């Protein structure tokens, strides 16, 4: 049953369950339930998962390091939905703490699948709106702003 086939109350319960499951995985240093949500075919389940990761990172300081470790692990996963959701989770964290997830964006920017690369652009846009600075990876000469991705150029689009 897809997310929006559920009633509003059931959706809220499902989001709460996703949050609890991911937090439990992080506390146990496991990834089974988180992986099932990150790889789910339903976009809204994946959205609930990446938003939960952002909330857990922000509200539970002792789990921050484990959260980043989980994202690092998932960033290398063979399933593009897992990698895409990982980028989106990094975007949730990057709104407040960009430096700790910048390397996740670096990896995703050169992913073989377009949905992962597109997630990088969308997530960095979200972060940029909050942190008010462009994302530029000097050594690779890659710049992303709120309007363009310029590979191999030092051109910056205006925001």
Residues of each region from the PLM?
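A generic short-segment signal for beta-strand/edge and adjacent turn/coil regions
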Residues: 2-6, 39-42
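Structural detector for internal amphipathic alpha-helices that build alpha-solenoid repeat scaffolds
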Residues: 3-25, 47-61, 83-96, 115-130, ...
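Amphipathic alpha-helical scaffolding segments comprising HEAT/armadillo-like alpha-solenoid repeats
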Residues: 25-37, 58-74, 95-108, 129-142
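Short, contiguous, helix-prone interaction/anchoring segments in small proteins
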Residues: 32-54
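Short inter-helical turns and helix N-cap capping residues of alpha-solenoid HEAT/ARM repeat scaffolds
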Residues: 41-43, 78-79, 112-113, 146-147
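Short, mixed-charge aromatic SLiMs
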Residues: 73-81, 117
């Amino acid at each position: 049953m897809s997310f929006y086939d559920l009633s509003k109350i059931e959706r809220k319960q499902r989001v709460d369950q996703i949050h609890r499951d991911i937090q439990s995985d992080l506390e146990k240093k496991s990834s089974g339930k988180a992986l099932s949500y990150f790889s789910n075919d339903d976009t809204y389940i994946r959205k609930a998962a990446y938003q939960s990761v952002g909330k857990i990172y922000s509200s539970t300081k002792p789990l921050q390091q484990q959260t980043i470790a989980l994202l690092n692990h998932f960033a290398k996963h063979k399933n593009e939905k897992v990698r895409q959701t990982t980028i989106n989770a990094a975007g949730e964290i990057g709104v407040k703490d960009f430096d700790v997830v910048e390397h996740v964006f670096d990896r995703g920017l050169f992913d073989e699948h377009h949905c992962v690369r597109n997630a990088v652009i969308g997530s960095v846009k979200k972060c940029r709106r909050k942190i008010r600075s462009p994302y530029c990876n000097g050594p690779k000469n890659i710049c992303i702003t709120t309007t363009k991705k310029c590979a191999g150029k030092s051109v910056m689009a205006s925001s």
